[in-house]
Amino acid sequence: MAADRIDVIHKFLCEAGLADQFHPSYTRMAPAHYVTEIALVGCPDPNPTYARFFAPRRNALPADVAEIGRQYIGAVSRDIGKWLEARAASGPIGVCFSGGIDSGSVFLLTYHAMLRLGMNPARLKAFTLSVDGGGEDLKQARRFLAALDLALFLEPIEATAADVDWREAVKVVEDYKPLDIQSAAMALALCRGIRRRYPEWRLLIDGDGGDENLKDYPIEENPELTIRSVLNNLMLYQEGWGVDSIKHSLTYSGGLSRGYVRTYAPADVMGFDGFSPFTSPSVIEIAEGIPFIELTDWRHDRLYELKGQIVAAGVTATTGFEMPVFQKRRFQHGAAERRHAAALFPAAESEYRRAFQEAWNP
């Protein structure tokens, strides 16, 4: 059986009188960019096999930040335009917005595309989560939009600490990776807040995937990573270590292929139709063509600066806006005051794993 959630498989087996044959670890997440083949040959069932269908060419672009930005953001803009015409031709559109590089560029590109397509930009809102009235994201969102004379589009979504429930997020995401669960808990609070205010709202767009494409994660925080492993491996942040790696989970895929549930599932359970243009293959293909080694010379600081340079240059080339660029901040760290955010989530991964097991064995 194929489904988008583990609990759907569980429900089907229960209804078929086969509940005793279920365990969440028996399921297999289909990895992004592969065809998954399952051989139905009887007991014992063999593991699936995987055939890659998407293999972008690395280092295909010139070491020119302006040209890279033009191509990269141009691809994002085209996909947003296609989405607007095919799936979002009518009804209000919400941007999950922090004023960061990814959500900021998505807002500006969506606004620009709507004008280009003759759509009414009054349909657009920038939704920013603020927990207990705090968080740097709301301040940043205000600065971002004010700098471009677009402040009228901002709509803060207020939540309380009680609205941020990491145990609920574990059940919704059906996973236990701490950073993904923390992000999903904030996404649930945001989506629930929007739903309470606008019962009929359907469309959301966000910037998930932008960090993975431009390799903008602090390498120092992960003892398994070096800048050489990040820059030498094809789509490392999108796919993890790869389906043939000893580090690859049997149940889950890796990288954003696994982690994207943090964005998809909260929106889905709250009744939204979401879109993340940075995850489009056409966009990832251009990102993988960036000559990162030549542009960074293996330096962490240059790598962390590169994303803002590329995206800002591309946004200017595509829309004419001079986009403000702020320092990277995770969703769970920006939506609440930093000193309070730590109290919302347990520090140990074992707590998340325990909650995951309890969800299936109450």
Q: Predicted segment positions?
A:
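RNA-binding accessory domains that recognize and position tRNA/RNA substrates
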Residues: M1-P92, V269
